[in-house]
Amino acid sequence: MKDVEDIHRPMLNSLQSTSAKMKKIVLSVNAGSSSVKISAYSALFGQAPIQLAEAQISGLTAPPPTLRYTRHGEKVINDEEVKDQKVSTQADAFDILVKALIDDNGVPEISSKEDIAYICHRIVHGGDFVRPKLISDETYHNLEKLNDLAPLHNSTSLVIVHRCMSDMPKTTFNIACFDSQFHHTIPEHIRTYPINQDIARNNHLRKYGFHGISYAFITRATAEFLGKKVEDVNIIALHLGSGASACAIKGGKSLDNSMGLTPLAGLPGATRSGSVDPSLVFHYASDVGKLSPASTKDLHISRAEEILNKQSGWKALTGTTNFGTITAALDPSSSDTTSHLSPEEVAKMRLAFDIFVERICAYIGSYYVSLQGQVDALVFAGGIGEKSDRLRAAVIEQVSCLGFGPVDKEANETRVKEELDDSHDVIEIAPPNSKKGGKDGREHRVLVCKTDEQFEMARACAEDGEFWR
């Protein structure tokens, strides 16, 4: 006798086939400590999503909060102060953004919450999850446990996940997309820390790697630009922003990432120290093992975590988190805002810039050896990677001995600004070098990629048959 599933299988297959042909609305959500960003897409199963609108509220930790709203690539609201509405948490910001989307007559596809089929949440630390995960109550509780590994990173996202699970229609599926999942291919000898392995396993202590959603996008965009299959691409990718990392990608898969157990390891950032001698923090302050005043009942943050994550980086060196201010100070003629700086202040800016360049180049050299010189491209991405032509030029000059560069000045300074937009994901800023590396003689290209984590999450959802129901 056939079981119920066998009897209804043709009907289930027919329903799934019909569902695959229907356009659905996918919402990508990226929650940070001071901002929340959502992007709405129309998608068919197995096809690239089409963006309908994008909205962001910034300034949650530095009021007043401001709203930015874009429809079909055109700015509708540009950093307008949010008034007459409570905005004290990420969940509050999310509610306002969804309402703005629903109230926009220019996006008729979304007239109510019921029109949203999927919500993709960027979760920084996914532990041992190796692919996006449909969020059930059990999954949510597992993600809560990961807060111990990433209290400063996962908690903001889970606030919105909880709001969606309680307030959005039951027909809306919540999907967790993890920044760490791209790096599950890092080999054991690279991801393992040389500590007692029984303790390491019991406490999940190993390198995880992060910025993986961005690196997945960068890898696909670079492969398309080079006219290669993803599985044939070897690149050294740099995601450079207020949080920065480097990644060695071999055959389209992560071989190594500069971040580790948490995003703190590796490159310095706006407020992160990056990798330092582990004993440094114990000499820095006497209370590093105590809980930070920023801790709450459910969120335990040590003073050490607070110092190295929130009170370090180039802010500690210069007093600013804005890398653009640092680079402008090195070329006073380019900005009136830095002309008042004293020679001592300019020297601090120079030190921060030089430290960042040196650390980046150290990873490029290390990863070049890991890839045995078989590197298709060095790829810059992230806010700083996309915007700072001075940084790109300095890095390329220092790694020119490996066969990268020389920089095309016009491409680096002008074309990137003018052409790197939604229609151009990748711009080449140095011609293929005649010096070829590795046993297979690959040409070393230098590229700038406009990464898009929001799109990457929506794409992953649209291509996964498990979610498309």
Swiss-Prot record:
Pathway: Metabolic intermediate biosynthesis; acetyl-CoA biosynthesis; acetyl-CoA from acetate: step 1/2. Mg(2+) binds at N30, E453. GO terms for molecular function: acetate kinase activity; ATP binding; magnesium ion binding. It comes from the Eukaryota. ATP binds at K37, H239, L240, G241, S242, G243. The active site is at D179. InterPro entries: Ac/propionate_kinase, Aliphatic_acid_kin_short-chain, Aliphatic_acid_kinase_CS, ATPase_NBD. Substrate binds at R122. Its cofactor is Mg(2+). It holds the Pfam family Acetate_kinase. It catalyses: acetate + ATP = acetyl phosphate + ADP. Transmembrane segments: none annotated. The keyword Magnesium applies. The record marks H211, R272 as: Transition state stabilizer. Belongs to the acetokinase family. This is Probable acetate kinase. It comes from Neurospora crassa (strain ATCC 24698 / 74-OR23-1A / CBS 708.71 / DSM 1257 / FGSC 987).
